[in-house]
């Protein structure tokens, strides 16, 4: 069983990102979906201590050399990650669902809207947004956890505890 900590839209709130890492407990992979990739560098030592692979993409507020799109495989499932602004996710998830189909991804993880969402495309592909740790639109900072096994993917949105 793999457990992925999924974060997005931290926008300089490194303390919230650190809190999510602590609150998530043990996890096998770390994903940051952009805005701001520099925040990942601030917590990279924590992630390296745990021996956790880091996957990140850049968002519309990032100017780093990070890629716009990445994918990886876990337990025979294909996970695609992107920020979402190029797919216009603030307006509709239709193009994201088509993108998932085109890439043959079992799950597409995206950010940009600052609103957590667990949805499935018309072909049953997971479309997952962990919300925002830095500037949540619904008032509560959130992150995501994905439990992945050969049986499938169990998505979960988690509210961030108070940052100390």
Name each model feature, range by range.
Residues 1-50, 62-68, 140-142, 146-153, ...:
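N-terminal active-site segment of His-dependent metallophosphoesterases
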Residues 53-94:
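Helix-adjacent hinge/juxtasegments
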Residues 75, 98-104, 121, 128-164:
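Binuclear metal-dependent phosphoesterase catalytic core
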């Amino acid at each position: 069983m793999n457990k992925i900590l999924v974060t997005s839209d931290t926008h300089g709130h490194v303390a919230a990102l650190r809190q999510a890492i602590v609150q998530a407990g043990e996890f096998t992979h770390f994903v940051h979906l952009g805005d701001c990739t520099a925040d990942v560098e601030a917590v990279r030592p924590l992630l390296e201590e745990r021996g956790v692979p880091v996957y990140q993409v850049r968002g519309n507020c990032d100017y780093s050399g990070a890629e716009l799109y990445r994918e990886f495989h876990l337990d025979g499932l294909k996970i695609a990650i992107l920020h979402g602004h190029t797919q216009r996710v603030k307006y509709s998830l239709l193009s994201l669902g088509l993108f998932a189909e085109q890439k043959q991804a079992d799950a597409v993880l995206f950010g940009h809207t600052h609103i957590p969402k667990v949805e499935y495309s018309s072909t049953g592909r997971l479309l997952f947004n962990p919300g925002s740790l830095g500037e949540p639109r619904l008032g509560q900072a959130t992150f995501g956890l994905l439990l992945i096994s050969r049986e499938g993917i169990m998505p979960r949105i988690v509210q961030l505890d108070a940052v100390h």
